[in-house]
Amino acid sequence: MDFLEKVLDNQVSESKELVKLYDYDLYTLGEAADRMRQNMHQKIVYFNVNRHLNPSNICADACKFCAFSAHRKNPNPYEMSLEEILEKVKNSYNKGIKEVHIVSAHNPNYSYEWYLKVFETIKQEMPNLHLKAMTAAEVHFLSTKFNKPFELVLEDMLKAGVDSMPGGGAEIFDEEIRRKICNGKVGSSRWLEIHAYWHKLGKMSNATMLFGHIENKIHRIDHMLRIKKIQSPKNQVENKEGGFNAFIPLLYQKENNYLKVEKSPSAIEILKTIAISRILLNNIPHIKAYWATLGLNLALVAQEFGANDLDGTIEIESIQSAAGAKSRHGLEKEDLVFKIKDAGFVAVERDSLYNFIQKF
């Protein structure tokens, strides 16, 4: 039996073996990943109508890969008030967004109660808006700053109206690499524990992997396997229990930060990474090719290599664009639909839990 066939048959589980998948040519990997993708999702490409909101860029951490936080290369600190946040969300809601995605720097000036008040107010005023908020890194920050168990932070978030968690803060799970790129940030084990407890509460989240910086291919494989391990076996496609909805390989953006990575991965390596994630993560229903970091054209190509989602209209995005991504002003829904259909796929607007809203 060929090695790839053994992998597809779940006969290989070690990172040092699975890294050999990168030795396959792109066509072979893509064919295997696309076959899995079509078995799960046919020719559908999902998107949602959403807004990203980043309340502050003032951060207690100093991650070397980050161009968003206020530092020497980004000397313009800001922090939004509750009223400013509410106004921005309302404006977008009135334009038709179905989800607001709130991720902030780890601002030491905000109180614990402030976060909960933001969530409660949004849900009180817009109860039908899906509130995706608080990365595991933010949860850990609040837990340590305010001396609260992370379990309590998650329970308070749930009571305040948070519907799901984004997958940010995972970066790459190898602790040696984490010490070099984001020393002091939430550790890999705690990141996984936070998501596992959120799932235990019956809620959904995503998982990300930042790649294309100083990590190597075996670090990526190890990262994927750790995500796979904590995914509930009950949650393979239908998502009726808490678990990971989607895995999102995030391409590192190299501008305006201190990591000093000169060369980005080739398009071939990017597509191989996406294909391998589909092949390995057979218990996670969706693989997202995040157009805000890949660019829309490459993200559409990735739909032939295992991905089945582009993310959404985004509207406003600050974190990736600060590092050079071309996502600052988002996309119109009509443009996304046209691009998806023009690439030969069926465009489906989804809600945040992948329920169909409209098929195009």
Where are these regions (language model features)?
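Auxiliary Fe-S-binding modules of radical SAM enzymes
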Residues: 1-27, 87, 93, 224-228, ...
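Conserved, mostly hydrophobic/aromatic
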Residues: 10, 33, 63, 102, ...
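Conserved short loop/turn motifs at secondary-structure junctions
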Residues: 18-21, 51-53, 104-108, 211-214, ...
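N-terminal pre-triad scaffold of radical SAM enzymes
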Residues: 30-72, 77-103, 165
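Hydrophobic faces of well-ordered beta-strands that scaffold small-molecule active sites
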Residues: 45-51, 100, 131-135, 165-167, ...
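Glycine-rich, proline-tolerant flexible connector loops at the mouths of alpha/beta enzymes
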Residues: 49-52, 73-76, 103-113, 175, ...
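Conserved Radical SAM active-site core
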Residues: 72-229
